[in-house]
Amino acid sequence: MTGLPFRIGYGEDAHRLAPGLPLVLGGVAIPHAELGAVAHSDGDAVLHAVADALLSGLALGDIGQYFPDTAAEWKGMDSRRILAKALELVEERGYRPVNVALVVTLDRPKLGPLRADIAASVAELLGLPAGEVGVSFKTSEGLALEHVQTRVTVLLGRVDD
């Protein structure tokens, strides 16, 4: 295998929120959410950002290239499929995720009680120990009450043959 032993990827995603829609973050349904993501897929901003981080680490573009929001076939799609495709592309090139750090900005509901669930879900989807997925939560301090945003950094390691 050739190439750098490590690569760093960065991903970001945001969705407007509206009443009557589910809110899913990191593959976890968020209970008691009054607002949910407005999106072509299920609107999981965490998994979208993780997928983009995986792709950017190897200069493979972004999820919009693989799952355009103009294609009817992706309407309502479970974002775990998006992440699985990004992971497949990374693994095909001889890399795997080593560590993930993610920050979710959301004013309400408070997500602290779900930190371990979100970390465990993302870790499982990536084949990592839960301790390799760091999850932080922030608020917008009232600046943007009706949106969710996620920023993610991923460390990719080359898999030696």
Swiss-Prot record:
The keyword RNA-binding does not apply. It comes from the Bacteria. GO terms for biological process: isopentenyl diphosphate biosynthetic process, methylerythritol 4-phosphate pathway; terpenoid biosynthetic process. GO terms for molecular function: 2-C-methyl-D-erythritol 2,4-cyclodiphosphate synthase activity; metal ion binding. Its cofactor is a divalent metal cation. It catalyses: 4-CDP-2-C-methyl-D-erythritol 2-phosphate = 2-C-methyl-D-erythritol 2,4-cyclic diphosphate + CMP. The keyword Hydrolase does not apply. Its EC number is 4.6.1.12. A divalent metal cation binds at residues 13, 15, 48. InterPro entries: MECDP_synthase, MECDP_synthase_CS, MECDP_synthase_sf. Gene3D superfamilies: 2-C-methyl-D-erythritol 2,4-cyclodiphosphate synthase (3.30.1330.50). Disulfide bonds: none annotated. Binds 1 divalent metal cation per subunit. The record marks 40, 139 as: Transition state stabilizer. 4-CDP-2-C-methyl-D-erythritol 2-phosphate binds at residues 13-15, 40-41, 62-64. Pathway: Isoprenoid biosynthesis; isopentenyl diphosphate biosynthesis via DXP pathway; isopentenyl diphosphate from 1-deoxy-D-xylulose 5-phosphate: step 4/6. Keywords: Isoprene biosynthesis, Lyase, Metal-binding. It holds the Pfam family YgbB. Involved in the biosynthesis of isopentenyl diphosphate (IPP) and dimethylallyl diphosphate (DMAPP), two major building blocks of isoprenoid compounds. Catalyzes the conversion of 4-diphosphocytidyl-2-C-methyl-D-erythritol 2-phosphate (CDP-ME2P) to 2-C-methyl-D-erythritol 2,4-cyclodiphosphate (ME-CPP) with a corresponding release of cytidine 5-monophosphate (CMP). Belongs to the IspF family. Homotrimer. This is 2-C-methyl-D-erythritol 2,4-cyclodiphosphate synthase. It comes from Deinococcus radiodurans (strain ATCC 13939 / DSM 20539 / JCM 16871 / CCUG 27074 / LMG 4051 / NBRC 15346 / NCIMB 9279 / VKM B-1422 / R1). The gene is ispF.
